[in-house]
Amino acid sequence: MESAIGEHLQCPRTLTRRVPDTYTPPFPMWVGRADDALQQVVMGYLGVQFRDEDQRPAALQAMRDIVAGFDLPDGPAHHDLTHHIDNQGYENLIVVGYWKDVSSQHRWSTSTPIASWWESEDRLSDGLGFFREIVAPRAEQFETLYAFQEDLPGVGAVMDGISGEINEHGYWGSMRERFPISQTDWMQASGELRVIAGDPAVGGRVVVRGHDNIALIRSGQDWADAEADERSLYLDEILPTLQSGMDFLRDNGPAVGCYSNRFVRNIDIDGNFLDLSYNIGHWASLDQLERWSESHPTHLRIFTTFFRVAAGLSKLRLYHEVSVFDAADQLYEYINCHPGTGMLRDAVTIAEH
């Protein structure tokens, strides 16, 4: 049994765990492992937004243009494509890229082809919305959890390997305790989302500044290779409750501290749906994510179902990754997106102060 925290990230703990040292988890789970050369990763959520069906071809082409840019020097080591319909009826194509270090992502994003595409006046006049939500957690600021050991998705795809069975799972509070930084830091949030350029009500280009210790969760489901019984388990038992919980967070986020919640379906380069999905949730703080997870009926039902079936899972793949970030390691930019998009909804403007 291993700790979820890599040996090179372990230090004397000043904050106590929720369980005794003798705790044994009820079933096996694993985490991604990176060597000590990995200091910081970058997660880039690059979106194309449209509303009318006749805009779909242009939106898909814009998504392909973004993906093509990943082939340039210093592009991400891994990426995936997703689709989401928000509660305003807009469709969003989201390209998610992962880099193993900040410098390569900076070189890529500031290269002439990439920077000129995002900064072009065409982005303001082509009838589509675009957004960039880019965050860069340090190695001690993110954690992963997998119910499987091969072909890790998300940030796991840029890690160097997989752990053995880990101790910190199966109890409330284990998510926090998988963060290396949790050994000595409560990860308390401070500040607010603030619009620092543009006006969401007007449109055009808008930039939002984040604050310390915003939390981001990506919680995924992969039933592509599942047999009939596991497909039924996911589609008939897990998904309805999961959808209910995700819709609640999408529509009632401000009441519980959730800035943005998108339950997305993976797609291929032509926009066809794949049998994979995940949730993208931005939270004002990790403790607010914890409070919702531990108290909301929909998540409790999901958690109970997972506990019941986890030990017997074969080809239904469930996982999550959770990160927190310093304010300086976040960029939220929106171009002609509706004002309820992403971090725009809860960001305050100068006029509101």
UniProtKB/Swiss-Prot annotation:
UniProt: heme b binding residues: H299
Protein residues bound to an aliphatic aldoxime: S219, H320
Impact after mutating F306A: Retains 33% of wild-type activity with Z-phenylacetaldoxime as substrate
Effect of substituting R178Q: Retains 36% of wild-type activity with Z-phenylacetaldoxime as substrate
Temperature sensitivity of activity: Optimum temperature is 30 degrees Celsius.
The entry's keywords: Heme, Iron, Lyase, Metal-binding
Activity regulation (UniProt): Active when the heme iron is in the ferrous state. The activity is enhanced by reducing agents, such as Na(2)S, Na(2)S(2)(O4), 2-mercaptoethanol, and L-cysteine and supplementary additions of electron acceptors such as flavins, sulfite ion, and vitamin K3. The effect of various chemicals on the enzyme activity is different in the presence and absence of the reducing reagent, Na(2)S, which acts not only as a reductant but also changes the substrate specificity of the enzyme.
Phenotype when changing E143Q: Retains 14% of wild-type activity with Z-phenylacetaldoxime as substrate
Function: Catalyzes the dehydration of aldoximes to their corresponding nitrile. Is active toward various arylalkyl- and alkyl-aldoximes, and to a lesser extent toward aryl-aldoximes.
Protein name: Aliphatic aldoxime dehydratase
